[in-house]
Amino acid sequence: MSLNNIIKNALVSLSDKTDLLKISKILAEKKINLFCTGGTADVLKKNKIPVLEISDYTNFPEIMNGRLKTLHPKIIGGILGRREKDQKIMKLHNLIPIDIVIVNFYPFEKIQNRKEFTIEEIIDNIDIGGPTLVRAAAKNYKDVIVIVDLSDFTSCIQLINTNTVSLETRFDLATKAFKYTALYEEIISKYFLKKNPYRKKHQKNIFPNEFQLNFIKKQDLRYGENQHQKSSFYIEKEILKSGTISSSNQIQGKNLSYNNICDADIALECVKEFSKPTCVIVKHGNPCGVSESNSLIKAYFSAYNADPISAFGGIIAFNCLLDLDTAQEIVKKQFVEVIIAPEIDEMAVKILKRKKNIRLLICGKIEKNKKGLDFKRITNGLLIQEYDCDEINAKNFDFVTNRLPTEKELEDAIFSWKVAKFVKSNAIVYSLNKTTIGIGAGQTSRIDATKLANLKVKDRNHNNTTGATMASDAFFPFRDGIDNAALIGISCIIQPGGSIRDKEVIESANEHNISMIFTKKRHFKH
């Protein structure tokens, strides 16, 4: 191999032809011969750019409606041929050395993300020749420059001008090429795993024997969970739906930190549970104030007042347009790290920009949680589970006490139950009028979580908690949780049930005239 070889021949095969003319003109100006497939060659000929059509060079036509174009020994051999070792065999078979390969693939990903497409369309957009050309060029990186990211083209041309395309550069381009082909194959394989039209429903396996993930960097973060930890934010390569922290757009404020993103994600996912204007305030991975109301400013005011001390420096999420009045109330009341909403009124943005450090995120239209997979990294391993996104249907509840909940109690109980799903276990949530009044989060015993929620209620001087509801993310192992809840006026409790002491727990509720609901489903969160 000699890095001093003059670049003479380039193969250009672009499905996305946005930059085709620009690239081809530059190559032609450098007296570099262009080898192209029929469609690409036609475009160049119309623009009077000299080109050699591959079928003319190979003396073999494109067949099968374009399915077979570039897979020919004269093409693959011209790319794979090592300049020092294979010269003799290349001359024997009249193989022209290809020095540059510039390729992008059929738009499989774009097709599969359309609302409507046929299986024939998706199959036709599986590129065969392109990945073969790219892999061959990357394998022979010492002699062939491979470009799959057109942003690399300008810098490569500058190096070609000075004949200084180093081995390091060639290897980097080859690395990017192999990543490109690997990701392309992964996207296709994922589609086939999920969308097999011939597989019966009962045969579907969401947990294959091997699991691969593909993410791209969205941004570097200020730091990780702690300031001495470096951190970056990666998002799924496949198209993102709106209404997530990953798809959100930051319009002002300092760079996000690792903790900002974690808390904003929890806040946003929690607020999606509610249909009316709702505010969720999160601190250190736990909701500290949640309220649903007929107006957003009332929801914010109530969520903030649920626990104003914890709300200091918190993350706020809304499920609807953030208006001017609410923005003014936020600025007046508290220090906030992040605000995220589907959209923000222009006047509200102006108000919030007075606080330059507030990170302001617009996430776009939100939808209630849908089914998907959740991942948790452990040492040398990965845990995968379905999202906890079960629909709540009161018809499936068991009402197990002598007294049934009133309509209002049932509404508040369901509200509390929705919030409890996002509170770290052991979790206890007290609510009144669709507003949390005390949250006991992350305790190692359920009674401690209950006592903490009681303490939150007392600290806020809630004078009238009669009629408040209590949600527990898991069953009560003993009656002590119910006895403690009764001390502050809890009148309805919602919990999964399933304890060996359920009878004792129900008896306690009856003694205190508390209605109790069994959901028969648990909401642990670790």
From Swiss-Prot:
Keywords for this protein: Hydrolase, Multifunctional enzyme, Purine biosynthesis, Transferase
SMART domains membership: AICARFT_IMPCHas, MGS
Superkingdom of the source species: Bacteria
One of the record's GO cellular component terms: cytosol
Biological processes, Gene Ontology terms: 'de novo' IMP biosynthetic process
Pfam families documented for this protein: AICARFT_IMPCHas (PF01808), MGS (PF02142)
Pathway: Purine metabolism; IMP biosynthesis via de novo pathway; 5-formamido-1-(5-phospho-D-ribosyl)imidazole-4-carboxamide from 5-amino-1-(5-phospho-D-ribosyl)imidazole-4-carboxamide (10-formyl THF route): step 1/1; Purine metabolism; IMP biosynthesis via de novo pathway; IMP from 5-formamido-1-(5-phospho-D-ribosyl)imidazole-4-carboxamide: step 1/1
Entry EC number(s): 2.1.2.3, 3.5.4.10
InterPro entries in the record: AICAR_Tfase_dup_dom_sf (IPR024051), Cytidine_deaminase-like (IPR016193), MGS-like_dom (IPR011607), MGS-like_dom_sf (IPR036914), PurH-like (IPR002695)
Domain MGS-like residues, every copy: 1-148
GO molecular function, one term: phosphoribosylaminoimidazolecarboxamide formyltransferase activity
Catalysis performed (reactions): (6R)-10-formyltetrahydrofolate + 5-amino-1-(5-phospho-beta-D-ribosyl)imidazole-4-carboxamide = 5-formamido-1-(5-phospho-D-ribosyl)imidazole-4-carboxamide + (6S)-5,6,7,8-tetrahydrofolate; IMP + H2O = 5-formamido-1-(5-phospho-D-ribosyl)imidazole-4-carboxamide
Record has Transferase as a keyword: yes
Domain remark in the UniProt entry: The IMP cyclohydrolase activity resides in the N-terminal region.
Sequence similarity: Belongs to the PurH family.
Protein name as annotated: Bifunctional purine biosynthesis protein PurH
Organism: Buchnera aphidicola subsp. Schizaphis graminum (strain Sg)
Organism ancestry: Bacteria, Pseudomonadati, Pseudomonadota, Gammaproteobacteria, Enterobacterales
Gene this protein is translated from: purH
